Amino acid sequence: MKGIILAAGKGSRLYPMTRPVCKPLLPVYDKPMIYYPLAVLLEAGIRDILIIIPPGEEGPFYRLLGSGGRLGVNITYEVQEVARGIADALLIGSQFIGNDDVCLVLGDNIFYSLKFGGYLKQALQHREGACVFGYYVDDPRAFGVVEFDAQGRAVSIEEKPRYPKSNYIIPGLYFYDNSVVEIARNLEPSARGELEITDVNLEYMRREQLHVVKLDRDFVWLDAGTADSLLYSAQEVKRVQDATGIYIACPEEIAYRRGYIDQKTVLRHAAELDKTLYGRYLECL
């Protein structure tokens, strides 16, 4: 399986912060926002990663992540010249995907749970079709809402419904088999001129191949797309890290635990950050 991070948004809801710096490179507490979706892919065991970025941002991304060698993975980049919707990432990445399955994660979504690895394993077990996650919210009217049966099969999806059929929404993490490329190619733009990821999921549901993994109520999902949510996300990351002593979305730690890099490499990274708490954390792995 390959992984795609869609990190090409202008971040207009974060202006003027994102005029000089693109949104995925903004800090969320102690690390760049892009580390959070990257950590998800690493935790899922995905080592071939494509990051879709805005025009003119190749330099900053490459200075931060390079080609992935420091994490023992392969990272490549593609530019989304014009914002055409989330599903456009599947077309931009079609050559990268090739004959493989793919995991798509949004660049401003933050996921945290001590049981996250187990949820990812559940999603990866569905080798045919697609798998999304069901996240409980009290008021789902501003989101894409999914209804599913006792077997975890989606039975309805509604985008920002006035009267939701469930309290479960779909966060920005999607697992697809290889037929997703064909599905994306056959999409028609929506009324707002975009290729909607909801339409991709609806097609899988029509084929009775859309699976839903229900997340427990203690699972943390954050969308850091506005100034308030960015601040709240940073505060939550700090709160959890201070309380547990475990860093959220530390790519070096995940790569080390999975055997992608050795301790010598971790210590070299730690030495580069020796004046920071992040560097000291790496020293103790």
Question: Which role does the model predict for each range below?
Answer:
Residues S113-R141:
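Conserved donor-nucleotide/metal-binding helix-loop-beta segment in metal-dependent transferases, i.e.
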